Amino acid sequence: MDKTLSREEAKQLMQLLCLDMSCWGNLPLMRRQYLVKCKEYHPDKGGNEESMKLLNSLYLKLQDSVSSVHDLNEEEDNIWQSSQIPTYGTPDWDEWWSQFNTYWEEELRCNESMPSSPKRSAPEEEPSCSQATPPKKKHAFDASLEFPKELLEFVSHAVFSNKCITCFVVHTTREKGEVLYKKLLQKYQCSFISKHAFYNTVLIFFLTPHKHRVSAINNFCKGHCTVSFLFCKGVNNPYGLYSRMCRQPFNLCEENIPGGLKENEFNPEDLFGEPKEPSLSWNQIANFALEFDIDDVYYLLGSYIRFATKPEECEKCSKNDDATHKRVHVQNHENAVLLQESKSQKNACTQAIDRVIAERRYNCVTLTRKKLLTKRFKKLFNEMDKIVVGERKILLYMASIAWYTGLNKKIDELVVRFLKLIVDNKPKHRYWLFKGPINSGKTTLATALLNLCGGKALNINIPSEKLPFELGVALDQYMVVFEDVKGQIGIEKQLPSGNGVNNLDNLRDYLDGCVEVNLEKKHVNKRSQIFPPGIVTMNEYCIPETVAVRFEKTVMFTIKRNLRESLEKTPQLLSQRILHSGIAMLLLLIWYRPVSDFDEEIQSNVVYWKEVLDNYIGLTEFATMQMNVTNGKNILEKWFE
């Protein structure tokens, strides 16, 4: 203690601790008094701040000094061992003695040299009466310093892990090993437990019927080892660890199963806990959304939960009308039951929608526009197999073709030219303008073309500050329709005014398609892409020259009374949205165009549907439909009363 603090500092510290100097060196007493005085001197308790600072500095200095002295003593003890002392009087002993003295403090060294004594003649060597100090016995190996190196390859080395496992090994003293062996067996109902001696310590190996974290086992054991050392580890190779602890330097003490364990006796439940309960497969939901191209969270959730009903109790499955539905229902029934019970239904469906958007983004970047259109047609053909079933449905779709023929005699050429426009997507030749009076068929045709190719309709009659998010809807879309654009000045005074034409004039880069533009959605980062081509529909507004030159073609519409009357008398075309569907446009192309006009990948589908249409309606019947349209009659008057 004399090497820790100076005499004056020691007196100051003892005065602050209110202890007599006779107690100097009684570290436990000084520690207790220090904690008491900290509460007394602390400024928050009304004490003296200066006294508190002085007490802390002196006490911390004392602690550091005591630690340094202990370290020095340990170094001195470890300099040499008695077994290493050479024989006294030999040159080796002189060298060892010189090395031994180098560790002592400088002031204790003595560099004096003794005067040499006169040599005396010795006819005979007398036997030496001195001998070296006998070597001390080696201390027994202390196995409590670290976990046995022989077992490191079998255990987990994770420091912080939430993984739950069923196999553990605990390393502690012999005394605590006796206690923990019984406590662990009782607490965790171990399916197997064994105790192994390792020098002066004990290892306990055990398997639990249920999964636990290593930290939970460690905390339980610490409650019984407040002073004794403790190592607790999870086991990666249970049988390898157990068999190694049955060989030297380990000794098997006891185990709850006579004869121990053999490698083939380990069941999966022993190693991995209880059989894993089936969990909700988010990937299966995503695959379903990808197959049917669903990008609406709530529609996906509603559709998928329907599969929770048993297939044998499902009306659609029992009718056998839709083979695809029955296949998908059987595949997804078990997962749908889990989704129904899950608390993360929306999260699972949101991730599935993200997969759909990611797939769409990938296709937009990697596939050509012709390939994308072919893929869209394939999807429509799949829908036709489910929707266009039976004579009544086919006649309704043929009636829509007759109506479009009445709208434009060369409707097929118009559609083919438009498809070529959006497939080529040439800069400054990407947009058509549909212009005409109210109820002249502009929106009907534009919507059908939009559904044929796939895309979104946009409203740009809104204030300019709201435009960025409206335009962001066009992200990854094949085409767009700027619907019912309003201008400031119209040929007819009763037309309402709006910001549409003015906003369109400010979107020249969007219409031209020469450079990439930034598109953004809420909660999504901006992305640069060429804005998709499309159609602009408007009434008879005046268009500035800067906007007009950006339209590759302007299609003028006029009011045809017979078209309106035939629709009124054939309400199914509107109520069932047949006239606005992409299927109607695709059937129109199949009816009018030769097979060679279609891509080779879908020519077989085109041939099939041409045969289907020919079986239900011939040229004479179709001519009758056209005549009914021209006369403003019910298009299906001959077939439906």
From Swiss-Prot:
Any single GO BP term: DNA replication
Motif (Nuclear localization signal): 134-141
A GO cellular component entry from the record: host cell nucleus
Bound cofactor: record note: DNA helicase activity requires Mg(2+).
Chief location category: host cell
Domain SF3 helicase: 410-572
Organism: KI polyomavirus (isolate Stockholm 350) (KIPyV)
Record keywords, A-Z: Acetylation, ATP-binding, DNA replication, DNA-binding, Early protein, G1/S host cell cycle checkpoint dysregulation by virus, Helicase, Host nucleus, Host-virus interaction, Hydrolase, Inhibition of host innate immune response by virus, Inhibition of host interferon signaling pathway by virus, Inhibition of host JAK1 by virus, Interferon antiviral system evasion, Isomerase, Magnesium, Metal-binding, Modulation of host cell cycle by virus, Nucleotide-binding, Oncogene, Phosphoprotein, Viral immunoevasion, Zinc, Zinc-finger
Region span, Disordered: 114-136
EC code(s) of this entry: 5.6.2.4
Catalytic activity line of the entry: Couples ATP hydrolysis with the unwinding of duplex DNA by translocating in the 3'-5' direction; ATP + H2O = ADP + phosphate + H(+)
Localization (cell): Host nucleus
Taxonomic lineage from the root: Viruses, Monodnaviria, Shotokuvirae, Cossaviricota, Papovaviricetes
MF GO annotations: ATP binding; ATP hydrolysis activity; DNA replication origin binding; helicase activity; zinc ion binding
Phosphoserine modified-residue sites: 117
Motif (LXCXE motif): 108-112
Subunit record text: Forms homohexamers in the presence of ATP. Interacts with host HDAC1. Interacts (via LXCXE domain) with host RB1; the interaction induces the aberrant dissociation of RB1-E2F1 complex thereby disrupting RB1's activity. Interacts (via LXCXE domain) with host pRB-related proteins RBL1 and RBL2. Interacts (via C-terminus) with host TOP1 and POLA1 allowing DNA replication. Interacts with host TP53, inhibiting TP53 binding to DNA. Interacts with host preinitiation complex components TBP, TFIIA and TFIID to regulate transcription initiation.
Matches recorded under SMART domains: DnaJ
Residues noted as binding Zn(2+) in the record, renumbered to the chain: 314, 317, 325, 329
Residues that, per the record, bind ATP: 436-443
Cofactor(s) for this UniProt protein: Mg(2+)
Domain notes: The J domain is essential for multiple viral activities, including virion assembly, viral DNA replication, transformation and transcriptional activation.
Protein name per its UniProtKB record: Large T antigen
Residue intervals of every T-ag D1-type zinc finger in the record: 277-369
Ranges of residues in domain J: 12-80
